[in-house]
């Protein structure tokens, strides 16, 4: 290409990231005569650092919040009957805390801690049909690690405690407790049912990130979620320029708030559009009923609630 030939960008497609409380739209542009853009973004710099160093970045906090929002949006009310009293209990979400009791001389390292956690999750997937969940690691004041787990699956409090203590015992982590109290049944778990979930995502993110630093010894992921939630969060709707008006039309509703995400001003004071956000409450999705966006959201919720596989086309092009 001649150095005098004009180079410019054209829009190739639009991408939509669907979340229960926001729809994020970005415009994808490419240079007509090749990419002259040499600017390193902050995101690219962050990708160089693989270890989390026991901390949650701003981006990780947003992902944690997103995973909790999907868990809340897809969870259904369940009726549980007590075998002792025949009383019907309402259930929607469980908040579980798993703790490792004090050790005499041992500090639990990352590798062993991961093994214990994964063993418990595998056990519950097999015997309790553990479905959707989000977990986050935190540190006690005495440097002991514990795990918070949010799940839409009911697990009896005694099964939670018995299974966790069994795994701890098999890994030699109850010997000090037995030496002091002559038993292998410490109060190492806590479980609460959350029925009022209107603001649970915001509350749980605040609660689960209040102690952001875990430990210099722990360089692994400090949070994660079930594979189905992870899969849903990775889905992106790709829309061709010819279809963009059709997709955007249902979002032009006064009840749906709109917000632009801009870059920080450059040396000339100019900011550039990065993304457009359409802010919703969960009940606002009914306003989009009949639209392609609504059908995708409904499909994602059904996927999280059942064993059904995703079958919807995420590439919307001109027919």
Region locations from a protein language model:
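Right-hand nucleic-acid polymerase module
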Residues: 1-143, 154-319
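Calcium-binding loop positions in Ca2+-binding modules
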Residues: 146
């Amino acid at each position: 290409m001649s150095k005098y030939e004009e180079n410019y960008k054209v829009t190739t497609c639009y991408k939509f990231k669907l979340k229960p409380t926001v729809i994020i739209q970005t415009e994808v542009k490419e240079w007509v005569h090749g990419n002259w853009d040499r600017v390193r973004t902050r995101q690219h710099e962050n990708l160089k650092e693989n270890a989390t160093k026991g901390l949650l970045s701003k981006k990780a906090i947003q992902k944690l919040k997103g995973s909790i929002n999907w868990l809340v949006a897809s969870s259904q009310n369940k009726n549980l009957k007590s075998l002792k009293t025949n009383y019907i209990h309402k259930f929607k979400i469980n908040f579980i805390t798993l703790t490792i009791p004090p050790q005499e001389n041992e500090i639990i390292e990352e590798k062993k801690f991961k093994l214990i956690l994964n063993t418990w999750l595998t056990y519950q997937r097999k015997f309790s049909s553990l479905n959707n969940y989000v977990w986050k690691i935190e540190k006690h004041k005495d440097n002991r690690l514990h795990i918070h787990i949010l799940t839409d699956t009911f697990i009896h409090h005694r099964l939670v405690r018995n299974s966790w203590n069994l795994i701890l015992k098999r890994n030699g982590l109850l010997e000090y407790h037995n030496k002091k109290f002559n038993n292998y049944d410490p109060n190492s778990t806590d479980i609460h049912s959350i029925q009022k979930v209107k603001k649970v995502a915001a509350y749980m993110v605040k609660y689960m990130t209040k102690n952001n630093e875990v430990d210099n010894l722990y360089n692994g992921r400090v949070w994660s979620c079930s594979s189905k939630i992870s899969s849903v969060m990775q889905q992106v709707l790709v829309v061709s320029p010819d279809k963009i008006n059709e997709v955007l039309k249902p979002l032009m509703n006064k009840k749906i708030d709109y917000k632009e995400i801009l870059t920080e001003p450059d040396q000339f004071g100019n900011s550039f559009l990065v993304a457009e956000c359409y802010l919703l409450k969960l009940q606002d999705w009914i306003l989009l009923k009949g639209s392609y966006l609504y059908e995708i959201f409904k499909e994602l919720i059904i996927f999280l609630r059942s064993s059904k596989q995703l079958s919807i086309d995420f590439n919307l092009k001109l027919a």
